[in-house]
């Protein structure tokens, strides 16, 4: 059997960890949290309106 320093699993964990770290850095450094919350709020409103319109048609 061949033993390597890095396996596919550990590299996947490393990639996801890096992405999570970059996301957290964006939230703390660039104050992206408020922008993201505003985006989610707008999307929620839009989806509620679509649901109401679809329910009204039935």
From Swiss-Prot:
Flavoprotein among keywords: no
Listed GO biological process terms: tricarboxylic acid cycle
Keywords noted in UniProt: Membrane, Mitochondrion, Mitochondrion inner membrane, Tricarboxylic acid cycle
Membrane topology term: Peripheral membrane protein
Subcellular location: Mitochondrion inner membrane
Protein's pathway: Carbohydrate metabolism; tricarboxylic acid cycle
Cleaved signal peptide residues: none
One GO location term (cellular component): mitochondrial inner membrane
Main location: mitochondrion
Quaternary structure and interacting proteins, as annotated: Component of complex II composed of eight subunits in plants: four classical SDH subunits SDH1, SDH2, SDH3 and SDH4 (a flavoprotein (FP), an iron-sulfur protein (IP), and a cytochrome b composed of a large and a small subunit.), as well as four subunits unknown in mitochondria from bacteria and heterotrophic eukaryotes.
Protein name: Succinate dehydrogenase subunit 8B, mitochondrial
The species this protein was found in: Oryza sativa subsp. japonica (Rice)
């Amino acid at each position: 059997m061949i033993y390597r320093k890095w396996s596919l699993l550990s590299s996947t964990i490393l990639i996801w960890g890096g992405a999570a770290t970059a996301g957290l850095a964006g939230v703390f450094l660039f104050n992206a949290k408020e922008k993201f919350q505003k985006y989610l709020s707008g999307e929620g409103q839009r989806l509620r309106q679509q649901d109401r319109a679809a329910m009204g048609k039935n």
